[in-house]
Amino acid sequence: MQHVRTSGPGDEVAALDVAGVSHSYGPKRALDDVSFSIAPGTFTVLLGLNGAGKTTLFSLISHLYDTRRGSIRIFGHDVSRASGEALRRVGIVFQARTLDLDLSVHQNLSYHASLHGIGGHEARQRIAALLDTVNMQGRQHDKARSLSGGQIRRIEIARALLHRPSLLLLDEATVGLDIQSRAGILATIRKLVETEGIGVLWATHLIDEVEDGDHVVVLRQGDLVAKGKVADVVMATSANSIRDAFSKLNRIGPADMAEISS
């Protein structure tokens, strides 16, 4: 494995620390001894082909599945032992769309706020501010079903930020979106990292999105095969670009690369 630290220098507590994590579905191995960490205020891209283990890892981090081998800590809290404390610091955007399409934008967001004990004036203030953050101001009364795919994604990001998490997880957040929508969402996340100091783990199979990250973690069929700064991973694999490095790490040819490059 090509290895460069993903966390920053010093003894700062990692926003996310994944240590020796393995997971199987019956006889099928989904993850095998995966370890990496993310420093607060950094943007890490989790890159892998479909079936690499990205969604399984997200399910373990969010405690949808129990971590039976290895450990996952969020700001020092083990998610399997103190899940409530750990997960209160996390915002999650899953690949599947999860807005209630029969409700308005405001109703979707206010319901989520209520789950975190946020209501009344404070909820309205946070919703208004976040709609501005994701460039959806003035759309609070629109029905969710009237929104485009990119707009729904923006609302889901706003929802994930309502309780002011310190770590944001996004699983294939731009799948099915046009290039302009993808670029806009990535720019929004990049700005959150820089202005709010949020740690981000962005899972994708699209190589073009790697350049937006500070670091990259590469999964291949459940194995972690590279991690570090993008330039360092490229250098360690004797590649000319991250696209070339990914091709080498996954042992795939030009025809397959075309599918994951746009």
Name each model feature, range by range.
Residues 110, 114, 121-139:
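Conserved ABC ATPase "signature" region
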Residues 164:
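Conserved catalytic motifs of ABC-family nucleotide-binding domains
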Residues 183-195:
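Helical segment within the ABC ATPase nucleotide-binding domain
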